[in-house]
Amino acid sequence: MIRYIFIFSLFVAQLHGQTYKAVLYNGTGAGSQEKLLAMTLAGIVNRDSARLYLLNVYETWSYNQTDEKWRDIYRSYGNVQFDSVQIVSQLIDKFREYIQGGISYDPNRYYSNFSGQNFRWQAEQAAMIGGLCNRLPVTSAMATLYNLPLSDSVLITDSFNDDSPVWVTGKVDNPTHPWNNTSLNEEARYLTLLNWGVQNILPLCNPSKFYIREITDWTVSQKMFQVNLAGTDGLDLNSMSVSKADILENVLTYLNTKNSDRIFHIYGWIQPEPMTQWFAFFGSSFHETLLGNLSFHSSFQVEQQYFIPKSKVDPDTVEPDNKYYIIFLGSEGDAANWVVGFQSGAWFSADRGKVPVGWGWNLHLFDECPFLAKYYYDTGTQNDGFLSVTSPLGYAYPDLWSGAVLQNAIDTTKYLMNRFGVDNIYGYKHYAGAGMMTYRGKTISNSFNFQKYGQFQKAIDAKLTMLFDPQLPTQIPITGYQALMFNHTGDGSFYGTATNLTEMANRIITNIKKQTKPGFLIAGYQRFRQDNASISSADITMPRLIQVVNLIKADPIVGMDVEVVTPEMFSVLMRKKLGLLNTREDENIPVGFALHQNYPNPFNPETVIRYQLPVSSKVTLGIYDILGKEVTKLVDKEQEAGRYQVTFDASKLASGVYICRIIAGDFVKTIKMSLVK
């Protein structure tokens, strides 16, 4: 039996139904320099509380009403009262107490990695440096206009390693800097600055998070090291120049060293996309986050809770019938553009809930931004199935992680699955053109290492792993790799054409007829869009999906036996058919004692500690400082056999390493936890 112990953290204003006040900056019509300043400001002031919301500063490309919708939801659902501002000088004045001055840059320094991109490289680095010392990126003229003093050098305090403060440039545009050597071309100048940053700025930045591409408020708030590097092609790994790849590898190697026994996270985007596999070899997980306001979403605190989708299925209440069970899955679930962007607006369809759908989510982003999770869980219906894409830890490849980080990856994955009530996963690899290639000493493949992948899925207790892989049989259950897998490939169900709905329905009907009852079919892995969107050939809307379902059910041969289900129902029925599910899953007793690594770690200010008992025991769970002095006792009582979780709130403690120790009968274990403020 699973039991949860919570220490609740709740805004007093929300607890008593009072209004929560924040500032809204309306960036509609603002220039790129003003927007960069506003994003940097938001990143600085939103670190410990949600103070500044950005409207139309850096909105999701997938749904252009994302900022407006979340603004309205915060007003009605979060009881937020926004003080709206559109003039930058007024915005700065509202938060001047938080700002130490400016970091100057040359606004005429542009660079592009590929056709269609163009960014101010000095400005982005000024924003990153400014975020580390609470200063805003400005030109010399802006510094005068907004009364933001400049300094030749600024002192940066290391928030993560307790190292001595370091002086760095306060003027990125200083002509004496090597990256301002006018004899160099623009790329050489930018890469010179990045290489300087790797040596001087990276050690001062967040050792567990890294950002690639255009800088955002999230980058600043988390004090990440940032680079804006990409290849010229979306898929060709060799389109990334050697000099750029060298910089990335130097950063990844450093982060791997700092996180030798745990996963670190990369945010932003990478082109070519197969580099996400290369990143995984260094022990990372990736997250597409090309959008603003994550600093606000992550800092808007809600009651610490565990979530159960309304689509959750009690295995004891259902049995497979003489039917064909089919599912439609929403793609892009790992990407913030879909997680934050309301599934590209499809979440607001009046037809959502009329037919079962499997919505993909990034559980790591949910954990970082629990208000978002709470909204989706509260507004979901029984027909809104939830699954994790491509891993609960994000856009990740568990089969590529080394043994050193595996236990942490398993522990954090199980925590995320447990917190969000999601135990079905969709994974894929499909970006190595030749099927397999070697890139900088690492093997990039179109297929998983099924033995390693299956071992990981078993370790996290994934109930069903759906995947797209060219090497596995299609549309049949696979149990030969220690975990239940179900693949779909080569039948038009992966980003299949949805332009002609009759043709789409006929394609699915043809695939259904290949099944024997009770049969199971992934009918479509499609990109869902808002109802009135201008859609591409692989996109679908809820009204169009309903038309497809009606066409399938109208088929005179199989139509009457087709049932569209959620991933949760699909998983339970398949396991019932295979004899893999015979007892209540939530009554399983652990086979041994365990104290798992806390998550998140490092943390600020809360972290969750999980432990398990195979028999009833007297449990003492305490927190100690590095000298062994007890800080607090979280548990001190008899507990029955089961799995437990407790939240440790360190908001009143100083940054540093703390020890968690459990004593349960003869079982004693400790873990180290890092509080970083």
Q: Predicted regions span which residues?
A:
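C-terminal tail/sorting-segment detector
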Residues: 633, 637, 647, 651-677
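Glycine-centered coil/turn sites that cap beta-strands in beta-rich domains
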Residues: 581-599, 603-623, 645-650, 664
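Sec-dependent N-terminal signal peptides
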Residues: 2-13
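Preference for solvent-exposed, low-hydrophobicity sequence contexts
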Residues: 18-304
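Catalytic grooves of carbohydrate-active enzymes
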Residues: 250-261, 266-267, 326, 331-354, ...
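Substrate-binding cleft of extracellular glycoside hydrolase catalytic domains
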Residues: 360-423
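Active-site beta->alpha N-cap acidic-glycine motif
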Residues: 294-377
